Amino acid sequence: MSNSSSQLKRGLKNRHIQLIAMGGAVGTGLFLGSAQVIQSAGPSIILGYAIVGLVAFLIMRQMGEMIVEEPVVGSFSYFAQKYWGRFPGFLSGWNYWVVYILVAMTELTAVAKYVHYWWPHIPAWVSVLFFFVLVTCLNLGNVKFYGESEFWLAIIKVAAVISMIVFGLYLLLTAGNDSIASFSNLWQHGGFFPHGFSGLFYMLAFLMFAFGGIELIGMTAAEAENPEKSIPQAINQVIFRILVFYVASLAIIMSLIPWNQLDLGGLDKSPFVMIFSQLGIGWTAHLLNFIILTAALSVYNSGMYANSRMLYGLAVQGNAPKVFAKVSKQGVPTSAVIFSSILIFGCVLLNYFIPEEALSYLMYMAVAALVLNWAIISFTHLKFKRSMKLENKVAKFPALFSPLSNYIVLTFIGMILYIMWTQGFEKSVIIIPIWIAFMFGLYTILSWKKSL
């Protein structure tokens, strides 16, 4: 692809890459999705995020090793196709595209929940439609616009979470004897595991959704100005972000009020907002709701970006219609952005017909697609390592503890499938082999047509 009408531009600077990696990891899975897990697991949710976060970090290092060696467009599908075969590449690319369609739809649905906190009279589909149009227009501009918008949205998230931790810590350290705020709330009121370890174990699949956007950095490689430097830096900082954004923030807010006294009500309310509201600090609750809304928009913005770049990559590889390989003068794959947007528009319809159930359905569908995606990345990395060994090459950014880390990841994925199967989400598990079979049939038909 040598002409200007078919190439992306390296318009993302190091600071963009760092914040995109951060932004993809902090969204609805933490700010809204943690409500249901707190009710089921209590304070042990902190350990749960640490466990899933560690697995996500291992995946990031495996992916990072491949990306630094070859910073190409459509990284996941490219590596699966090169080191595993054409069908794994075809499946990986389209599956990742579906993952981010679902993630974008989930975050967009969550935005309506946050708007509802202030204006309950506004229908969910109206809020969804407004932000859908706004973010779509943003992604049709130069990639630098996306980089800058995501940079500042992520800055807001980072500053907010750190400020909340500091403010929460201040409330804990200055609490009087009659205050309910205390670190002891983490082990009192039923203990750290109030419903036993099973209460946490069966929530791990739900927690996995929170880390669904963490591998987004792989999509930035083709548009990063210095991928060999920026990609490793961003990936290595992920573990510290997990400790701060997930572990530290939840430890602080769950110390402020006993977990069993939180008025959460399922997936409709953010525990971050409700805790400060129950403490009588209304202005903080409103400020946090605004911050959390920007967090959801940030991940949705990233989802739109990832969708279009993966679709572009599939087209370049010959696994999608060539029209999606065309880019504008600004280096934006316009056709890919528009087509992805049309699918995401389904979120507006979901919120019109089933506003109450939309978020829960989308989250578990996203986890099912994410399970397959992580498995493909880890399997592909094993084949990549075998190829590197045969060619006597030394990796510039080797994965941690490979191949042991690969087997840890794959075992964890098997465990997630078991949890989903036994906790009433059999359909999410059953749809995985059906999806693979459908994609294989489509791949076979397309391959046959190409051979004619």
Protein language model features and the residues they cover:
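Membrane-helix boundary/coupling elements in multi-pass transport proteins
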Residues: 72, 95-110, 211-224, 282-322, ...
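Extracellular loop-to-transmembrane helix junctions
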Residues: 8-9, 32-127, 131, 240-241, ...
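Helix-loop-helix junctions that connect adjacent transmembrane segments
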Residues: 3-8, 46, 120-123, 155-286, ...
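Membrane-interface loop-to-helix entry segments
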Residues: 112, 126-181, 212, 235-239, ...
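C-terminal membrane-solvent junction of multi-pass transporters and transport-like membrane proteins
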Residues: 152, 323-334, 371-425
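Helix-loop-helix connectors at the membrane interface of multi-pass transporters/channels
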Residues: 1-5, 78-81, 107-128, 160-163, ...
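TM-loop-TM module centered on a large, flexible mid-protein loop between adjacent transmembrane helices
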Residues: 78-80, 85, 117, 234-301, ...
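Membrane-interface "cap" regions at the ends of multi-pass membrane proteins
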Residues: 1-35, 39-44, 56-61, 70-73, ...
